[in-house]
Amino acid sequence: MSAAVAITAADPIGDLLSRGTWKALLEHHAHVGGQHMRELFAADPERGTRFALEAAGLYLDYSKNRINAETLRLLVALALDCGLPERTAAMFRGDLINRSEQRAALHTALRAPASERIILDGVNIITQVHAALDRMAELAEKVRGGQWLGHTGKRIRNVVNIGIGGSDLGPVMAYEALRHYSAANLTLSFVSNVDGTDLIEATRDLEPEETLFIVCSKSFATLETLTNAHAARAWSLRKFGDERSVARHFVAVSTNADAVAKFGIAPSNVFPMWDWVGGRYSMDSAIGLSTMIAIGDAHFRELLRGMRTMDEHFRSAPLARNMPTLLGLLSVWNNNFLGATTLAVLPYCLLYTSRCV
């Protein structure tokens, strides 16, 4: 599902309000905006099939949106008028489409095959991505196989991910949705709330000797994350009484090597983040280390291949049969023309009813 998209004249693309394609949609809305869903199905009994699409293993039925064939045609015309295909190509190329921060938005590179080349600032970032994946896999398989030993020589049985926002929500969602694939001899917990109760509850039944913490913070200065990380460190040290134990029970995902080293985490246990990955799109980067530990390297890479399949669909499918594009265009129609400003996401599958939905 796509979030609601409100467009105003103050936005950088607000000039589209004066475009002929936008005005055509306004005129179209004046004729069809009051139609009831019953009327739409009565006029086109086959709309349940006509307004449906399958791609990358997903089936989208958008027939219950208040649209007809002309609505769809006009929305696609609007997308073309705005240069969506060109903007899509720019994103995949690594152009600086994140205009507020003057950065690329290359989360798609995180699931690109090793054979691909994407050059950013003179560097093939795909090489960096796969080097990080291989390091993640090495750690994950050691933990899963009992080769990663804690300070006292015991194997790790508990993994606690400490993060907030995109460093928490994606991993939580992925773990809960895929928990049937997770290792039976490991427990996964997630701590994001600065309220100390969150960490207390997560560690209540855990043994420090068997617990590994993953601290996810690009700057290693995020208040909530570092508050919880230091509390976890203190919890661990109460058992060991030895600062050297931190190196066996904490790993980090960060770009701040100095702060991580000061915390006591070994440089070899620090995984990279990149400015060209937004937090909300980071679950397939090292932020997903907890997911990889839970489900294993093979399943994690299968997850990446699934994402890649949808990337390729988005990149190449005609706009009228392009699932992400259609969801975005329907959001524009529902919000800006029908006045539907709230989007409900109602998963029927219990595994998808995470706190992040």
Question: What are the language-model segments listed below?
Answer:
Residues T222-A229:
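Glycine/threonine-rich flexible loop motifs
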Residues L169-A184, D205-E207, A229-L237, G264-V270:
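A glycine- and small-aliphatic-rich helix-loop capping segment at beta-alpha/alpha-beta transitions
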Residues V159-M173, Y281-G288:
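Conserved phosphate/anionic-ligand binding catalytic regions in large, soluble enzymes, centered on
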Residues V129-L149, A174-Y175, H180-E210:
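Glycine-rich oxoanion-binding loops at beta->alpha junctions
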Residues N228, W235-R355:
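Active-site phosphate/pyrophosphate-binding segments
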